[in-house]
Structure formats: structure tokens, C-alpha cells
């Protein structure tokens, strides 16, 4: 039989008393009153803050949005099918953060930056708040570097600078996403990190974009944030902010980034759904009163940072879908007033075979001209005016039977210039090739060709210049100017190739 020694027992008790530390843990807890449609009403949570993350009994995460006298309205980041009335809810004391880092490049993630491409976990370098404050006035500098899209009509007439916000707006099926993907593909071999945010799109459309970018070798420097049409409204609302946080990580390390929001109309609709279910008072088109702030606080995060902060930049290309070309609707007018210009895509132009279907007359870039390279300014200076005059004359010429020779010449030149701006999808052009293309048209070197021959002639000319006049390409690319030597070289190339083209 074991002998019990009192001194041994007393020493064990004494040891346990000495090691005891009193820890009081205060947890802010509430109870679910009602749940459904991605919304939960919670009783309790007395000290919860707006935007704070909540943890439900089944592990679902929510965000407290409505703080009322007797309950809290929260939106769920999940389907919430396992949440029941009476379940406990815990306030976490945190606001939404996402992991960020270099390893995200080439990956497809959801609105909480979790990988959804089946390629395993992503090693993060840190975290960033989903809702970060935008850089202040002192933290910024004016836009002065170009961001080349590879599309002649944009780079020549509606130039975009690094740190600018340029809206892409148009009806459905007018090529808005194509403009965005071409811009991403054109950054290949450069120093720009791209983030593409797909909001409320079909999963098949997102898969197609991933395939396009992979085939073009563009996924190496691209992150895709995707919340498809079947995702909860909360996640569709958060996706653009997650994309901005991922881009900000690179911007604050001194790098240039490009972020595309495709499209913000669907984010506004998701936010409207959440707000109406939370019983917030509806305003114009049933959107809540703070829908302008929804987009302004997102787009203000795009900036060109000052020297002290490393001169990084975030260029934003938000996309808005219009209904029947109506740009005076609520969301389009809001985003037009926030951004630094817009590229307007027209369904009529698209259907008549002009692609990209950019309506040059009502598209504008408010700050990009400061970023345009000198060579482009030299050759494209009159292009927009000539096309605007051509559009006016073309409308007039339908009613007039006899036109003088000068008008006929102007119409002929305009038709060739319009042909020059047509571009196949996923085939962006480098700056030197754009300069050569525009110069050929504006200087009348296409006037003696039939309109149907223009595109094949220009394609051949570009190949001829690359092969036989490589010094022209390097000269324009390095000096960013279009000097007399470059002009002579280009004139010679046009004359030489035209002889070959006509002979064939």
C-alpha cells in the first residue's frame, strides 16, 4: 500500500498555488435573432464597432454594418446555412485584413485572398487592411509617366498615365474586358504588376481570361481576384477592396501597378442588395445614399506616390456597364465624376466592325496628355481633330450629292485613318510601331491605297520595319522622340515597302 506523506502533498499544493495566474478574459458576445439572405440580426454585442469582424458559432465570419439601439445588422461572408436563431456570436475586435505578398503573382484568389486555382496555399509576406486610407496630397506627385495600353486609339488620343484613374464605359458586349486584357498583355517585359478583379462574372468568363493571359505569358506578373455571380453579395462588395490592397502592397514597395475592376456596376448592385436587406433607406434607383462613397474611397487609392515614398504607382481602370448607351444613369455619372477621364465604347461602332469600338469624340483623358511621350505627341497631335472632322463630314455627306475635291480628299483620308485604328484582340502594339502606324496615316502615305488594303499594308509595313529598320525601333524606344533621322528612316521604309506591296 502506498504511504501518503503530508509534506509531499502540501509541497504540491503550494507549488500549484504559486504557479496560478489569474486571467480574466472579456468576450463581447451576442445572440442571433434572425438570419437569412446573407444578413444576420444580432442582439447584444454592446461594444461592437462598425466594420468589425464577427465570428458565428459555426465558424462563419460576418461584418457588423448597422449599429442600432437594440440590435446589430451584420452581413455574412458565406452562405450562413448552418447559422440558427439563438446561436452565439463573438466580436473579434479586428477589422477585415487580407494576406499580401510576392507569391500571389500568377494566382487566382477570392475576395479574402484565399487561393481558388487548386495550386495549394500561398505564402504571404504580411497583411494589409481591406479598407486602407488613400494617400494624401503630400504623399502624391502629378502623373508624368505613360502607361502604354498597346491600343493605338487610346495611346494616341486618350493617353493614360501611371497613377491615373481612367474609366472604361459601354454597353454589354462592346469589348470593355478586351481593352483591359490587351492592356495587361501589353505590360509583358515591362515593370508593371497587374491585378484583375472580376466581380459577379460567370465562372466560364473568368476561366477564359485566365487562359488568354496564360497563353500570352501575362499571368507571371498578374493576380486575379474573382468573385463569381453565385458568390454572396458581401464578397462581391469586398472583392475590389481586396484587389486594391494587393496592388497597394506592390505600390508601397516602389513599383508600378495596374488594377482593373470588372465591373463596378455589379459591385454597386451587390452593395444595394446588402443595404436594402439591412433596411437602409433607398435613394435614386434604390441605391443607398453612400454609394458614391463606395466607389470614391476605392478609386482614390490609385495614385502616383512622391519620391519620399518610393515613386510607386497604382493605375486604376474601372469598368462600368451601361444600359442602352445611357451614361446619365446614377452609377455611370458617379464614376465619371470620380475618375480622370473615360474611354467610351459604342455598340454601334462595335457592330459596324470598328474594334476596339472607341468613340473618340466623347472619350477624354484629363491628365494623361502630360504623360504622353514626345514622339507620340509629334505624330498624333492632329489625329483626334481629323477624325472628329471626318465624323462630322461623313454625316453631312450622306445628304449632299456633289462634294468639292477638298471634302472628298478629307473623307478619303478619314476613312483610312479609321481603318488604321482597328486592331485585332490580344495583339497590342509597341510604342515605336504605333508611331510608325500613325505617321503613315496622318502624312497621307495611305491615300493611294484602297480602304480594304490599309490593314494588310500596315501589318506588312510593321514587319518590314522590325526586320530591315531595327535602328528606327531602338531610336524611338530609347529617346522617346521622333527626330529627323527617325523620320527619314521611316519615310524610306514606307517607300520601299509600298513598292513591294504594289508589286505583289
From Swiss-Prot:
Species annotation: Ostreococcus tauri
Annotated site residue numbers, Required for activity: 363
Binding site for ATP: 170-177
Reactions it catalyzes: ATP + H2O + 4 H(+)(in) = ADP + phosphate + 5 H(+)(out)
Domain of life: Eukaryota
Quaternary structure (record): F-type ATPases have 2 components, CF(1) - the catalytic core - and CF(0) - the membrane proton channel. CF(1) has five subunits: alpha(3), beta(3), gamma(1), delta(1), epsilon(1). CF(0) has four main subunits: a, b, b' and c.
EC number of the protein: 7.1.2.2
Keywords, ordered alphabetically: ATP synthesis, ATP-binding, CF(1), Chloroplast, Hydrogen ion transport, Ion transport, Membrane, Nucleotide-binding, Plastid, Thylakoid, Translocase, Transport
Localization terms from the record: Plastid, Chloroplast thylakoid membrane
Entry membrane topology: Peripheral membrane protein
Predominant subcellular localization, coarse grouping: plastid
Record-level GO cellular component terms: chloroplast thylakoid membrane; proton-transporting ATP synthase complex
Pfam families the UniProt entry points to: ATP-synt_ab, ATP-synt_ab_C, ATP-synt_ab_N
Family classification: Belongs to the ATPase alpha/beta chains family.
Function: Produces ATP from ADP in the presence of a proton gradient across the membrane. The alpha chain is a regulatory subunit.
Stored SUPFAM superfamilies: C-terminal domain of alpha and beta subunits of F1 ATP synthase (SSF47917), N-terminal domain of alpha and beta subunits of F1 ATP synthase (SSF50615), P-loop containing nucleoside triphosphate hydrolases (SSF52540)
HAMAP family: ATP_synth_alpha_bact (MF_01346)
Any GO molecular function: ATP binding
Full protein name: ATP synthase subunit alpha, chloroplastic
Enzyme class per UniProt: translocase
